[in-house]
Amino acid sequence: MSFESDLERFARRVGKSLDETCRGITIKWFSGTIMSTPVDTGRLRGNWQASQEAPASGTTADVDKAGNATIAKAVRKIGGAGSVNYLVNNLDYAEKIEFGGSNQAPRGMVRINHARILRIV
């Protein structure tokens, strides 16, 4: 074994670990946000859209009271280290809910999960 091959193996291992760590953090953040979304009909929770490189536009017809389907869709779209990941909810009332418009989530959805992730990382 050469020094070069040792370095290559190390770089692959570190790269994979870093990629998995970044992806895992993003999954926790996005999942927490989705599950913190207050539920009436499930439309708000079902309208979270994950994407890479650019925020998703428009809304969906998805309704997801449990949140599992929305999380599964988000997980499939999340990239690892070096990726720019977005989670957006384009429903017209999502911003109102984020800033105190719901008794179920008076502190919002995104902000509380962002703060939670910052404490962990």
What do these predicted ranges mean?
Residues 4-93:
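Short, low-complexity, charged/polar segments at coil/turn and helix-coil boundaries
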Residues 99-121:
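Protruding loop/beta-arch "assembly-hinge" segments enriched in small, turn-prone residues
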Residues 94-98:
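Short, cysteine-centered beta-strand-loop-beta hairpins and adjacent loop/turn segments enriched
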